[in-house]
């Protein structure tokens, strides 16, 4: 990178920090609390999305703003999860799916991936033993190619799933080692095996049959009504591509660790302002 490129990036970083400082000023002044209240009162509790999926993007860029390493950004992002789940639950949303780690993310530097795996292991154990999780009867599940994860992470996931398997008040799905295209490929392979064994005929294959063979098959409301992506990127990045055919998409400029309740409420309000046609 040339000197002009470095200067440009530095100015961009400074600009983001100014915005963050401004957000903090608003928080401290109480203006955002007033706006939050206005948004909350504007939301129709009878027209909430049943399932909200979130692409939690921007951890590394948030770390750059603070002059920290990437792990710091991932740590902040993991801490943000608890807050967002509380916002969703308190609002009356039933299901939240979080895109935590894609199959493509394995291509990142080994040191970063290793630290992420340590963080995932720690957080799954924390979730499983969290008093709030049990008080509100939250069911926790991981979806993806779990077999690709280190054994210690698989063990932590199993522990969290076992500890919460009998709950049905609120559902949290963690998409980890997940890829939407791979999910469809895996579903097709399972169906092909059943055709080969004579259990089903090719003519039996339809949308409902494919639904039953996806990672999300046993989830309540498997198709998200609303998908939120943070960081300003406007794409779904191989996330729930089968299930999101009629999802409403909401893109938010703020990085995931800096995501605020007011941003969440704005996404829900925006969802309620749209007319869902489902292809009609």
UniProtKB/Swiss-Prot annotation:
One Gene Ontology molecular-function label: magnesium ion binding
Cofactor(s) needed by this chain: Mg(2+)
Catalyzed reactions: geranylgeranyl diphosphate + 7 isopentenyl diphosphate = tri-trans,hepta-cis-undecaprenyl diphosphate + 7 diphosphate
InterPro entries, per database record: UPP_synth-like, UPP_synth-like_CS, UPP_synth-like_sf
UniProt cofactor note: Binds 2 magnesium ions per subunit.
Active site: 57, 105 (proton acceptor)
Entry keywords, A to Z: Magnesium, Metal-binding, Transferase
The protein's Enzyme Commission number: 2.5.1.89
Gene Ontology biological process terms, A to Z: polyprenol biosynthetic process
PROSITE patterns: UPP_SYNTHASE
One Pfam family linked to the record: Prenyltransf
Presence of the UniProt keyword Transcription in the record: no
Sequence positions that bind substrate: 58-61, 70, 74, 102-104, 106, 108, 229, 235-237
Binding site for Mg(2+): 57, 248
Function of the protein: Catalyzes the sequential condensation of isopentenyl diphosphate (IPP) with geranylgeranyl diphosphate (GGPP) to yield (2Z,6Z,10Z,14Z,18Z,22Z,26Z,30E,34E,38E)-undecaprenyl diphosphate (tritrans,heptacis-UPP). It is probably the precursor of glycosyl carrier lipids.
Quaternary structure (record): Homodimer.
UniProt record similarity statement: Belongs to the UPP synthase family.
Protein name: Tritrans,polycis-undecaprenyl-diphosphate synthase (geranylgeranyl-diphosphate specific)
Organism: Methanocaldococcus jannaschii (strain ATCC 43067 / DSM 2661 / JAL-1 / JCM 10045 / NBRC 100440)
Gene name of the encoded protein: uppS
């Amino acid at each position: 990178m040339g000197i002009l490129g470095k200067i440009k990036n530095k100015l961009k970083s400074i600009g983001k920090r100014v915005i963050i400082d401004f957000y903090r000023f608003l928080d401290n002044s109480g203006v955002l609390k007033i706006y939050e209240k206005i948004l909350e009162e504007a939301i129709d509790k009878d027209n909430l999305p049943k399932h909200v999926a979130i692409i939690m993007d921007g951890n590394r860029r948030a770390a750059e703003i603070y002059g920290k390493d990437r792990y710091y950004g991932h740590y902040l992002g993991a801490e943000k999860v608890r807050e967002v789940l509380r916002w969703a639950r308190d609002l009356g949303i039933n299901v939240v799916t979080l895109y935590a780690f894609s199959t493509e993310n394995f291509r990142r530097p080994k040191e970063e991936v290793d630290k992420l795996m340590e963080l995932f292991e720690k957080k799954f154990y924390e979730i499983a033993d969290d008093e709030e999780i049990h008080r509100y009867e939250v069911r926790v599940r991981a979806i993806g190619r779990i077999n690709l994860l280190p054994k210690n992470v698989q063990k932590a996931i199993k522990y969290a799933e076992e500890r919460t398997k009998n709950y049905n008040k609120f559902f949290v799905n963690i998409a980890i080692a997940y890829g939407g295209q791979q999910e469809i490929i895996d579903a097709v392979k399972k169906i092909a095996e059943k055709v080969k064994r004579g259990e089903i005929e090719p003519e039996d294959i339809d949308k409902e049959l494919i639904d039953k063979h996806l990672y999300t098959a046993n989830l309540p409301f498997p198709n998200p009504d609303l998908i939120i992506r943070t960081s300003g990127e406007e794409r779904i990045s191989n996330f729930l591509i089968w299930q999101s055919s009629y999802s409403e998409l909401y893109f938010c400029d703020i990085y995931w660790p800096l995501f605020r309740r007011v941003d969440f409420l704005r996404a829900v309000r925006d969802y309620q302002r749209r007319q869902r046609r489902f292809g009609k």
